[in-house]
Amino acid sequence: RYFNPESKLQKSGHGSYVDLPNGETWLVHLTSRPFVPELRCTLGRETAIQRMEWTEDGWLRMKDGGNLAQEFVEESSLPEAPVRPLPSHDDFDSEELGIQYYAPRIDPLSFVDLKARPGWARLRGQESGCSLNKASILARKLTSVQATVGTKLDFTPLSYQHTAGLILYYDNMNFVYLYKYFSETLN
């Protein structure tokens, strides 16, 4: 594994730059912050921002002259544009799914129904959590290593293949799943 101990931000890449009207140039990119020594990135991919500048010969470079993603950068001279925080709780009493939700590799609207039973999110099961194709996982990104999570469940499994519950999901091979299921031996 590649790890540079000189930077808290690792795996930087997949970015886009913007030239602002005030002359500033910024780059937003994906990154991760691994926990040492395991180098596990519990919070997954995050978005970072870097102050950039164009060189005289037309190359884009980091304004600080380095090549490592910086955890902290100088502020823009643009006026503040406050962003409303995402709600920490959802009763699913809207007909629209909030922007804080996503699903691995598929559109959550392909398996989530908010209209059939107001106040609930009805998920139509598809493939297992290990699937790379159509796992019905309605996800919300953790933004802190300390969190309290919970869910309410109304589910009656009819087969050993039916499960529903709460999942802490990193990827299709790394997750913790607390679920209700049908046991053929326990009935």
Please identify what each model-predicted range represents.
Residues R1-N187:
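Carbohydrate-active catalytic/glycan-binding domains of CAZyme proteins
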